[in-house]
Amino acid sequence: MTTITLKTLARQYKNNGQHAEQVARYTLTGEICKADNKPFTAGGDCGDIQIKSARATVCHGTDIKAHIAMDGANRYGYVNADFTVMYLMSADEWLEFASLFGTVTRESQSNGGAVKMRLKVESREMTEWLRARA
């Protein structure tokens, strides 16, 4: 696992996941562009990197191994809660991270009520785990 110090970028989205993706993309490419909603099988959010933040949906259902196998990304970036650091992980590191710090929830009934796996709110334990491996 490696870390990337992120550049500061004025917030354009209320959604933390969209802001995390935009800040990471700006740091890596210098581009400021609209957040996308492309399918995970179509590739990473920025090159071969899938970018996530706290409370992000990891996968629909609970089979994260199958999700990673179908994923178009080769690496996974977790952007911390204050948008200053991205922890860049391999698929194996991401599997371990998401398994430890993920939780199973349901979509709202208005969205079909399907089961999905999400990352938990960023905690001290999560931060310590990331720092110990970076």
Predicted regions and their residues:
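Nucleic-acid endonuclease domains
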Residues: M1-A134
